[in-house]
Amino acid sequence: MSRVAKTPVAIPAGVDVSIKDDQINVKGTGGALSQAQNALVKISNNEGKLSFEPVNDSREANAMSGTMRQLVNNMVVGVSKGFEKKLSLVGVGFKASASGSKLNLAIGFSHPVNFEMPAGITVTTPTPTEILVKGADRQAVGQMAAEIRAVRPPEPYKGKGIRYSDEKVVIKETKKK
């Protein structure tokens, strides 16, 4: 059995988990998420804890049990606490502004870059050089943050660009004559 799947997922108060034949639905204060259930994994709910077991002894079923456990755990944490990614803009004149579900970036191009946030994702700018992406779906939050960063990734000589707040950019040494 997968080591990840051995630990059950605790369901906190205020979170409702329903398991149908092929769908797992999680509802909480942060929203509602659903995940397709894999046929190789048996999910059981006992006393507020979800346990995951492979249906057979195949390697694929063993791997999927750990994957399903982590996906459901991310859903439970997402609807109860939520996920967030923090990005910072480094460079002279680099600015970000959020209005509603739109993000406008002025990052040294001849034109402004605009992003439309998908449903369930909120974006805020605490300062003009910081972007905060929040949501219940961990994958969607990470994907949106990666798409924003990909517009202008940090360059290796001065470090200018959009980076994650905890990212360390290795600065290269310039060419010497």
Swiss-Prot record:
Annotated keywords: Ribonucleoprotein, Ribosomal protein, RNA-binding, rRNA-binding
InterPro entries, A to Z: Ribosomal_uL6-like, Ribosomal_uL6-like_a/b-dom_sf, Ribosomal_uL6_a/b-dom, Ribosomal_uL6_bac-type, Ribosomal_uL6_CS
GO molecular function: rRNA binding; structural constituent of ribosome
Cross-referenced Gene3D superfamilies: Ribosomal protein L6, alpha-beta domain
GO cellular component, one term: cytosolic large ribosomal subunit
Keyword match rRNA-binding: yes
Record bears the keyword Transferase: no
Superkingdom of the source species: Bacteria
Gene Ontology biological process terms in this record: cytoplasmic translation
Role summary: This protein binds to the 23S rRNA, and is important in its secondary structure. It is located near the subunit interface in the base of the L7/L12 stalk, and near the tRNA binding site of the peptidyltransferase center.
Subunit organization: Part of the 50S ribosomal subunit.
Similarity section: Belongs to the universal ribosomal protein uL6 family.
Protein name as annotated: Large ribosomal subunit protein uL6
Gene that this polypeptide is encoded by: rplF
